[in-house]
UniProtKB/Swiss-Prot annotation:
Keywords, alphabetical: Coiled coil, DNA-binding, Transcription, Transcription regulation
Family: Belongs to the GreA/GreB family.
Source organism (scientific name): Neorickettsia sennetsu (strain ATCC VR-367 / Miyayama) (Ehrlichia sennetsu)
Entry function: Necessary for efficient RNA polymerase transcription elongation past template-encoded arresting sites. The arresting sites in DNA have the property of trapping a certain fraction of elongating RNA polymerases that pass through, resulting in locked ternary complexes. Cleavage of the nascent transcript by cleavage factors such as GreA or GreB allows the resumption of elongation from the new 3'terminus. GreA releases sequences of 2 to 3 nucleotides.
Entry GO MF terms: DNA binding; RNA polymerase binding
Protein name as catalogued: Transcription elongation factor GreA
Superkingdom of origin: Bacteria
UniProt entry tagged with the keyword Transcription regulation: yes
SUPFAM superfamilies: FKBP-like (SSF54534), GreA transcript cleavage protein, N-terminal domain (SSF46557)
Residue ranges the record marks as coiled coil: 45-67
Amino acid sequence: MRKLPITREGYCKLQEELEKLVKVVKPSVVAAVAQARELGDLSENAEYHEARKEQSFVEGKIRELQLCLSEAEVIDVSQFTGERVKFGASVTLENMESKSVLIYQIVGNLESDIKEGKISVSSPIGKAVMNKEVGEIVEIDLPSGKKTYKILGVEFRQS
């Protein structure tokens, strides 16, 4: 079985999402199905069919999260030190052309979220900076074209 790297924070978020689906969302969907069933003829009961569709979606999401959690390997980022980019590192990058500064945390596919500044280790930026050190220049192939960045800092912190 393949193991998928994930930070402790990411693992906890997935567990919380699963718990909410199992304890709150699923029971309410099951109740909606039962209530719609009481309305009579199921062949023409739009409420029933909609509730069943929602139930299937929720059950699928629960199975997906259970599988993700079973395949997850929690990496304790707080144990890492140094100036080399590793999984879980927060990396400060300077665009060599525009001089703009970006900070990203390198995380697993299960927890990447660009809005939170978390990018996947398998993304173009993640691949380009992995195992590089502070001060190194990296060229990254992005959809918008090649960009050159300097690694200004590497930090390991457990959020």
